Amino acid sequence: MTLVPYVVEDTGRGERAMDIYSRLLKDRIVMIGQEITEPLANTVIAQLLFLMSEDPTKDIQIFINSPGGYITAGLAIYDTIRFLGCDVNTYCIGQAASMGALLLSAGTKGKRYALPHSRMMIHQPSGGIIGTSADIQLQAAEILTLKKHLSNILAECTGQPVEKIIEDSERDFFMGAEEAIAYGLIDKVVSSAKETKDKNIVS
């Protein structure tokens, strides 16, 4: 069971308790800190849409510490990021692997960050294939289609040729923070909030 801390604020009308994620949302901060599943994606998407409705011009910050997860769930978050009218600042803290790396790279160019000891990883999609021979063929075709989509997205986000993305993704391809800059996955390594362009997290 995941423990969620609560914070207490003085509202002027008394004290109000809220979970830490709701408090962060007030500062337009969204956290992806686990495997990317459909329920998580729906929660993140709802948060992003809420923040867009609150102010469609103000930056949103997404902090990522995720081993990856389901492709369709990750793509749903990716499409929502692209749908927003505001800039989205992405941060890797810990790890951004697989779909986590794709979402990290999807931030607004110039505003994609990683902390010094972060690790990033890209690889090709995989899945257990069972069923009849016809089912196996259909599922294999779907995996190839998803592989093409993911490679094209990463190529667009990083500036790397699609062929290089495909080649590098054949196996788990790990990068440190500085290597991720060279690859085009992020724009800057930061060790302090003051080093970012994000006014919402710098007091």
UniProtKB/Swiss-Prot annotation:
First-listed, main subcellular location of the protein, grouped into a coarse class: cytoplasm
Described function: Cleaves peptides in various proteins in a process that requires ATP hydrolysis. Has a chymotrypsin-like activity. Plays a major role in the degradation of misfolded proteins.
Subunit structure as annotated in this protein's UniProt entry: Fourteen ClpP subunits assemble into 2 heptameric rings which stack back to back to give a disk-like structure with a central cavity, resembling the structure of eukaryotic proteasomes.
Annotated active site: S98 (nucleophile), H123
Official protein name in the record: ATP-dependent Clp protease proteolytic subunit 2
Source superkingdom: Bacteria
GO biological process terms on file: protein quality control for misfolded or incompletely synthesized proteins
Native organism: Chlamydia muridarum (strain MoPn / Nigg)
